[in-house]
Design a protein with these regions (language model features):
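Soluble catalytic domains of membrane acyltransferases
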Residues: 1-173
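A conserved active-site cap/scaffold subdomain adjacent to cofactor or substrate pockets
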Residues: 176-179
Length: 179
């Protein structure tokens, strides 16, 4: 079941804020059902093997490094955030799995702050007035079975410029509001 899948513009910078009920199917589903091409943020440790890195990069996946996986400090992701900004400035689509993990629970886990940091960093460094965040929800009947039914829901855009003034006054509060 697909809802509003035409809601992703191809002529504007878009951050997709997606949930992540399954490990590998979610990014594939987004790439199959949504246009334009999507760059997917992916757990960094799976890029350590050269053959895996090549395969993942060929399908527009790029690494992100989580502290809970043993990576220290946010500076490891500075290059990741710059990569995202470079794609957004070119009016491309970047998908961030905002819960920071996959799970089969039928509820959304707490949203991590990476998406907001990417959005505000892009706006601060490049000021794209049309930068938007589009929520995308994936839900499966079971999630752990092959040939399961997928419901893919594309929500209304959230414009980063609407949060910019709040970010300038208090970045932490604006990040929490945007999340």
């Amino acid at each position: 079941y697909l809802h509003n899948i035409a809601g992703i513009p191809s002529d504007k910078p878009v951050l997709i804020a997606a949930n992540h009920p399954t490990a590998f199917v979610d990014p594939i589903a987004l790439c199959i059902y949504l246009d334009p091409p999507i760059y997917n943020m992916t757990r960094g440790d799976i890029f350590q093997r050269p053959w895996a890195r090549k395969m993942l990069e060929d399908v527009n996946m790029f690494p992100v490094f989580r502290m809970r996986d043993g990576y220290t400090g946010r500076e490891r992701n500075d290059g990741v955030f710059e990569f995202c900004q470079s794609k957004l400035v070119k009016k491309q689509v970047v998908a961030v799995y905002v819960e920071g993990e996959h799970h089969l629970d039928k509820q959304v886990k707490p949203v991590q702050k990476g998406l907001s940091r990417i959005a505000f960093g892009t706006y601060q460094n490049h000021a794209p007035e049309d930068l938007q965040i589009i929520p995308v929800g994936s839900n499966y009947i079971y999630g752990d079975r092959t040939r399961d039914e997928l419901k893919l829901l594309v929500g209304a855009p959230i414009f980063v410029k609407d949060y910019w003034e709040a970010y300038q006054l208090n970045p932490a509060t604006a990040i929490n509001r945007l999340n």
